[in-house]
Amino acid sequence: MENIPMFTNEYGVASLILESVPYRKEAYIRIQSTLEPEKLLEECVKFCTLCGAQRIYATGHEFLEQYPFHTAILQLKGNRESLGETDASLFPVTEKTAEKWRNIYNERMKLVDNAAWISFTGMKKVLKEGDAYFVHRNGELLGIGKAKDDRLNAVASVKPGAGADVVHALSHALSSETVTIEVASTNERALRLYERLGFLQVAELSRWYEIPQNNL
């Protein structure tokens, strides 16, 4: 299911993230501009529900603060040099290994709040971007991730205790000494890892709220 970057009606503009609906029954609403947030939200929720969403989350307006808090997206920054070294190696994802990478990503991220779901079509975009990797040590798969410029766009370990090595290895694909990553505030395990590696929270990028589908 395709996302709708500009969902427009008489009440305003919002972005609808629908890619997870077929798999996790979740939809996300990002309010862009409105003078009538309640009515815009109602229309967005109706549309997401018609698409099959059973859980809906929204961000982008103070009106939403009346609803139950879901998670916040935090921006963390660290120094690549301070991450240390690892003997783990990076292997870029290819067309032959793309489906394996996608399956691992979706499996590891399915319980992470606000994590994207990558469809078969979405994986083609990942391949085109060329920033997806497997992380191995001596032939053993430690994890996967996405890394480009100054950002770690995804980190997932498949071996217990290998998270630090996966982060270290992925950082070698970056062109910047400053490493930036975004993490859900409810992903406590990841936050503990990044804190241990010297990352500091520098911003709260968004706050997401759970929207009831029957009480609007």
Labelled PLM ranges:
Residues 35-47, 159-174, 191-196:
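Conserved acetyl-CoA-binding loop-helix of GNAT-fold acetyltransferases
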Residues 141, 201-204:
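Residue-level detector of beta-propeller blades
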Residues 29-88, 181, 203-211:
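Acyl-donor-binding surface of acyltransferase catalytic domains
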Residues 1-7, 111-138:
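Active-site rim helix/loop that mediates acceptor-substrate recognition in acyltransferases
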Residues 55-58, 126-128, 145-147, 166-177:
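Alpha-helix C-terminal capping segments
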Residues 1-43, 136-159:
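Conserved donor-binding loop and adjoining core beta-sheet/short helix segment
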Residues 163-164, 187-190, 207-212:
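Short glycine/proline-centered loop/turn elements that form peptide/ligand docking sites
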Residues 1, 84-116:
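Short amphipathic alpha-helix that is part of the acyltransferase structural core
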